[in-house]
Amino acid sequence: IPYKEPMSSVADAILYAFETENFQSSGSCLLILPDDLKLSKKFPEAAVWHPFADQSSLWSQRGHRVLIELEADQGFQSIIICCPKQKEETLSLIAHAMGLLTPGGMVIVCADNLTGGKNLSKLVESLGVSAGNLSKHKCRVVWSQKATNSAIENATQRGGMQTRADGFLTQPGLFSWSRLDIGTDVLLHHLPLS
C-alpha cells in the first residue's frame, strides 16, 4: 500500500502563519512532532524530532536530520511544535524548545482547536512571556520568544519523568499518566510483584 500523506490542518495553519506574519523561514529550524510532510517542502533543511520510529523514518527519507534527543547546545533560530493532546506534555515541550533557541529566536506552536488550541495562548503565556497568535483552519498558532530560565526549568520538570504516590514512574503524555488505569490495577492484583 503506498504511503498517503495525512490531512493536517495544523500544517496548513503553520504555513498560513509563515505567509501572513512574515516569519523568517531561513536559518536553523527544528520541527517537533511534525505530523504532515507538507512542512518538509517549506522547511527542507529543518532538523526533526519525533519519538515514533515510523515518523522519524519518513522525515529521514525526505533528507531531514532526525534528532534522537533534544540537546541544549544545539541552538535553533526557529522551533515549530505540532502540539500533542496532553497539556503538561505540550507545556514541557514548549519550555524545552525555548531552552534550545538562539538569542532572538522564536518558538511557534500549533494545535487543533479540539486538542488544546483554544487554550494555547494561555499555556505559552504561563511561562511569563507575551505571545502573538492567530486562528486559521480550526487551529491556533501561537509564537513567542524565550522565557526566563526558571520558567523553562519548572515546566520542563513538570513534563518529565515523575514518581507517583503509589511508587510508579510516569510521565505526562503517557496513557493514564496521572492515575492507575484499570488494566494495570487488575494485573497488580493477579501477578507477582517480583
Residue ranges and their predicted role:
Residues 135-194:
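SAM-dependent Rossmann-like transferase core, predominantly class I methyltransferases
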Residues 87-89, 116:
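Short glycine-rich, flexible loops that bind phosphorylated cofactors or substrates
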Residues 104-114:
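Conserved beta-strand signature within the Rossmann-like core of class I S-adenosyl-L-methionine
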Residues 90-106:
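A short glycine-rich, Lys/Arg-flanked "PGG" loop and its adjoining helix->strand segment in the class I
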Residues 38-42, 92-97, 123:
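A short acidic, amphipathic alpha-helical/loop segment
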Residues 67-87, 194:
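A short acidic, Gly/Pro-enriched loop at the edge of an enzyme's catalytic core
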Residues 119-139:
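Conserved Class I S-adenosyl-L-methionine
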Residues 4-62, 181-194:
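Conserved SAM/SAH cofactor-binding pocket of Class I
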